[in-house]
Amino acid sequence: MINNPLLTVKNLNKFFNEQQVLHDISFSLQRGEILFLLGASGCGKTTLLRAIAGFEHPNTGEIWLKERLIFGENFNLPTQQRHLGYVVQEGVLFPHLNVYRNIAYGLGNGKGKNSEEKTRIEQIMQLTGIFELADRFPHQLSGGQQQRVALARALAPNPELILLDEPFSALDEHLRQQIRQEMLQALRQSGASAIFVTHDRDESLRYADKIAIIQQGKILQIDTPRTLYWSPNHLETAKFMGESIVLPANLLDENTAQCQLGNIPIKNKSISQNQGRILLRPEQFSLFKTSENPTALFNGQIKQIEFKGKITSIQIEINGYAIWIENVISPDLSIGDNLPVYLHRKGLFYA
């Protein structure tokens, strides 16, 4: 049985005066799914989020929430009727209302006096870990506490979709990690779908069900974090998703490419040209044989060693090209040592 998407965006285009900021955006989001819109500042990800919320009006395209059209030709459902939650960078709580009444505002009246509303508010405060803060006002809260209250307010009316615009960017690194984990856990437990805007690659790799890579108003690729990291469709996506080694290469056959390092097995299919570039991740290289059949074997020479405590970074030169390898277990090695270097996993060839 095929489940209908919770959200469907079709061929969305948006202009600010003569500048096009969204180019033919199309994607869908399943119920309970968490999607991260990942890209550099100014790439269009916040504009896309605001268009879904109803704060920005696209020039063309359609937005569907389940089987209900919320934006289309000559039709734009007002934001307050879309039944979506929205959380921005700094929470934006009402300073004259305490935590309880800020959350109650999410239910529509800001009072939360009847028994059903009280029960719902208490459930949400428990879920987001702010039950003990009910009587405090925003100025009495830390940045992380304010973000939890903002999420609680967005979850209060039980929306099926929550939109979050870089909700952790204003927090310091230690607090950001803690609040991020707590808020993601609360979202998972609530059963709501969510779309996050972020420029933090590591954050999206760690927490997303799917990631949409956005560049200059276009979605380059949307897929699971693992697929985007290890099997991206485009070289630019591959480089954006993590540290990479990119070398000119020639295709020897459909399974092998030749580059400065040597002959590299590749896993791409349907390659149209013989000349291109090969991409490898540094973590594919190891000084240890971690499997019976490594993908490839090279001879290398140690050029630099950097001890970092639990790991040691080692610069190895292979056929005149230097790469850095991080080893969790630090062997007794010296600069100038010659040793075998193992490659694990196949490379990616881009014509």
From Swiss-Prot:
Q: How does it sit in the membrane?
A: Peripheral membrane protein
Q: Where is the ABC transporter domain?
A: 7-241
User: What are the entry keywords?
Assistant: ATP-binding, Cell inner membrane, Cell membrane, Ion transport, Iron, Iron transport, Membrane, Nucleotide-binding, Translocase, Transport
- Report a single Gene Ontology molecular function: ABC-type ferric iron transporter activity
Q: Which InterPro entries match?
A: AAA+_ATPase (IPR003593), ABC_SmlMolc_Importer (IPR050093), ABC_transporter-like_ATP-bd (IPR003439), ABC_transporter-like_CS (IPR017871), ABC_transpr_FbpC (IPR015853), Mo/tungstate-bd_C_term_dom (IPR008995), P-loop_NTPase (IPR027417)
Judging by the UniProt lineage, the source's domain of life is Bacteria
Which parts of the sequence bind ATP?
G39, A40, S41, G42, C43, G44, K45, T46
Q: Which reaction does it catalyse?
A: Fe(3+)(out) + ATP + H2O = Fe(3+)(in) + ADP + phosphate + H(+)
Q: What is its main location?
A: membrane
The EC designation for this entry is 7.2.2.7
Q: What class of enzyme is it?
A: translocase
Q: How does it assemble?
A: The complex is composed of two ATP-binding proteins (FbpC), two transmembrane proteins (FbpB) and a solute-binding protein (FbpA).
Q: What's the stated role of this polypeptide?
A: Part of the ABC transporter complex FbpABC involved in Fe(3+) ions import. Responsible for energy coupling to the transport system.
Please state which protein family the record places this protein in. Belongs to the ABC transporter superfamily. Fe(3+) ion importer (TC 3.A.1.10) family.
Name this polypeptide is given: Fe(3+) ions import ATP-binding protein FbpC
Per the UniProt entry, what species is this protein from, by scientific name?
A: Haemophilus influenzae (strain 86-028NP)
Q: Which gene encodes it?
A: fbpC
